[in-house]
Structures are given as C-alpha cells and as structure tokens.
Swiss-Prot record:
Keywords: Decarboxylase, Lyase, Pyrimidine biosynthesis. InterPro entries: Aldolase_TIM, OMPdecase, OMPdecase_AS, OMPdecase_bac, OMPdeCOase_dom, RibuloseP-bd_barrel. This is Orotidine 5'-phosphate decarboxylase. Pathway: Pyrimidine metabolism; UMP biosynthesis via de novo pathway; UMP from orotate: step 2/2.
C-alpha cells in the first residue's frame, strides 16, 4: 500500500514547505483542483525540485464529452504525472477513447476512475444514482476495467468488494483516511490506514491529519508503518 499526501493548503508556499519536511520519504504528492488551478503546471516542477523521487498524482477528476476528455488527459500526460483521475460516470465510450489515446504514448500515467465521492452518504448516493452505493460502485468499476483503466477511487468500504469482483490487479485508491475516525469533517465514509490495508487498498490519500499536525513528518512516518 502506498501513501498519497494531499496538497490542499491555502498557499502554494505552505504546500512546498510541507513537502520540504517530507523530503526523502517514499510517497506520492497529490495535486488537486485547488492547487492546480491556482499554481499551474509549474507547481509540478517545483515538487520535483524538492525531491525527484516524489511521484505526482494529478487529481483533476476529468469529466466531459469523450474527445474533450481524452484531449485533456493527453495534455495531463504530457506533464509527466504518474497518476490521473477521471470520472467513471463519463461512461465507457469516453473512457475507452481516453485510454486508446494514452496507450499510444511511450509512457502514460495510471488512470484511476472515480466511482463515488467519499463525501456521499448512502442516502445522498441513492438520491443521485437511484442504486445502493456499493452495488453501483462495483458496476461502475467493472465498466472502467472493461474500458482499460488501471483502477478506481473508492472508499475503504468498497475496496475489498471491488477486488473480489474484479481481481487484485485492479487497483483501488482510497481517500477519507483519518487517524481518528470521529474526525470526519466533510467526508462521510472514513477509515484508518490499517483498515485500508485490511481491505486491500493499493493507495491511501491523507491530507488534513498530516498538515494539521504539529509534526507532519512524524505522522507520515507512522502512516508509512501501516502501509
């Protein structure tokens, strides 16, 4: 299991300062919408300057019509990121075209499909998708696998079911990881790192428990022990 550190702080300088503290550790730097829109592609180069061994996870959750989405993914791949997210709700045709475009490259990022955001409660998910959360997450994941993507973003509570249905080689990335599960904030389906490993998660995403800590590096070292 690998650790992705979410860089969601208010200022670019704060994100870079956090990474300076974590230099030399085996982790992924997750760049989301806020940081990428504010700081641009140059931010990715600044991450690499701090530690060239940090892998970069560009979490943009692409969602559009097929060719627009494929072209956007191609531009992201040109930035030499190591992982990229797309929405599974964009449907099989969009994902298939996207993967055809990326597979033509000598090197491409891992493509992870977002099934259900961890901010969804079961009730909210039913209202939007008219299906039970776990059932729909597996259905979307199966469609993603047929399209050729590498894995899915899901909560810890769907990870094991996805693996059982689609095989252990189909990757799962699980956000909503907390040190204290009572600290949900805007997430509904949270778990800790040990539970993520028990449920065969390949990647975990941790943000606020790290950068709200007095000693972020110590928190990361503890998380890495659980990985």
């Amino acid at each position: 299991m690998q650790l992705c550190v979410a860089l969601d702080l208010e200022k670019k300088e704060d994100n870079l300062s956090l990474l300076q503290e974590l230099k030399g550790l085996d982790l992924w730097a997750k760049v989301g919408l806020r940081s990428f829109i504010r700081d641009g592609a140059v931010f990715l180069d600044e991450i690499r300057k701090i530690d060239g061994n940090f892998k970069i996870f560009l979490d943009l959750k692409l969602y559009d019509i097929p060719y627009t989405m494929a072209n956007a993914a191609l531009e992201c791949a040109k930035l030499e990121v190591d992982m990229l997210t797309v929405h599974l709700s964009s449907a099989k045709s969009a994902l298939t075209i996207l993967m055809q475009r990326l597979n033509a490259l000598k090197k491409r990022p891992l493509i992870m499909g977002v099934s259900a955001l961890t901010s969804f409660s079961e009730e909210e998910f039913l209202m939007v998708y008219n299906a039970p959360l776990k059932t729909q997450a597996i259905k979307l994941s199966a469609m993603g696998k047929e399209s050729g993507i590498d894995g899915v973003v899901c909560s810890v509570f769907e990870s094991l079911a996805v693996k059982e249905a689609l095989g252990k080689d189909f990757l799962t990335l699980t956000p909503g990881i907390r040190l204290d599960k009572s600290d949900k904030e805007d997430q509904e389906r949270v778990a800790n790192a040990k539970e993520a490993k028990q449920n065969l998660s390949d990647f975990i995403v941790v943000g606020r428990p790290i950068y709200h800590a007095k000693e972020p590096r110590e928190v990361v070292l503890e998380l890495l022990k659980d990985c």
